[in-house]
Amino acid sequence: YEHLFWFFGHPEVYILILPGFGMISHIVAYYAGKKEPFGCMGMIWAMMAIGLLGFIVWAHHMFTVGMDVDTRAYFTSATMVIAIPTGVKVFSWLATLHGGSLKWETXXXXALGFIFLFTVGGLTGIVLANSSLDIMLHDTYYVVAHFHYVLS
């Protein structure tokens, strides 16, 4: 039953973040004085990739339930692949800021804080994507920190 729970419940995590990504893109572009974010089409493709990949990585929440090594290897690899489109988004946000005249207002500071915390959460997520490390870090504050950093 755990597979059913995560198979249907996990993709929503990656789908629910998409509007937040859109808001950050608009906020960063506005407060950098740009008309649109850097790499607009790349950002759109990255969001579609993140949404689709969310459907094939559910079992990274289940590394400790006795999956065989081949299954763990697949979910480790598939989970790490999510870092690629996510990195495209973070790079594009930072590239949007580059060369602009950043206005240090509340919404710009919140967007920069989100980008920083989301990046730290992504780095901890890459560590947790490794099934061997995930098993060792299971039920620790490292996992709690990852979850909260990604949620920013």
From Swiss-Prot:
**UniProt keyword list:** Copper, Electron transport, Heme, Iron, Magnesium, Membrane, Metal-binding, Mitochondrion, Mitochondrion inner membrane, Respiratory chain, Sodium, Translocase, Transmembrane, Transmembrane helix, Transport
The record's section on PROSITE patterns has: COX1 (PS50855), COX1_CUB (PS00077)
Broad enzyme group: translocase
What's a single GO CC term here?
respiratory chain complex IV
Cross-linked residues for 1'-histidyl-3'-tyrosine (His-Tyr) are 10-14
Binding-site positions, heme a3: 146
Cofactor remark? Binds 2 heme A groups non-covalently per subunit.
Lipid bilayer topology: Multi-pass membrane protein
Does Cytoplasm appear among the keywords?
no
Give binding positions for O2.
Answer: 14
List residues in topological domain: Mitochondrial intermembrane.
57-68, 128-140
Highest taxon of source: Eukaryota
Q: Which GO terms describe its molecular function?
A: cytochrome-c oxidase activity; heme binding; metal ion binding
Q: Which SUPFAM superfamilies match?
A: Cytochrome c oxidase subunit I-like (SSF81442)
Which coenzyme or cofactor does it need? heme; Cu cation
UniProt: Mg(2+) binding residues: 138-139
Subunit note = Component of the cytochrome c oxidase (complex IV, CIV), a multisubunit enzyme composed of 14 subunits. The complex is composed of a catalytic core of 3 subunits MT-CO1, MT-CO2 and MT-CO3, encoded in the mitochondrial DNA, and 11 supernumerary subunits COX4I, COX5A, COX5B, COX6A, COX6B, COX6C, COX7A, COX7B, COX7C, COX8 and NDUFA4, which are encoded in the nuclear genome.
Annotated family: Belongs to the heme-copper respiratory oxidase family.
Role summary? Component of the cytochrome c oxidase, the last enzyme in the mitochondrial electron transport chain which drives oxidative phosphorylation. The respiratory chain contains 3 multisubunit complexes succinate dehydrogenase (complex II, CII), ubiquinol-cytochrome c oxidoreductase (cytochrome b-c1 complex, complex III, CIII) and cytochrome c oxidase (complex IV, CIV), that cooperate to transfer electrons derived from NADH and succinate to molecular oxygen, creating an electrochemical gradient over the inner membrane that drives transmembrane transport and the ATP synthase.
Q: What is this protein called?
A: Cytochrome c oxidase subunit 1
Gene expressing this chain: mt-co1
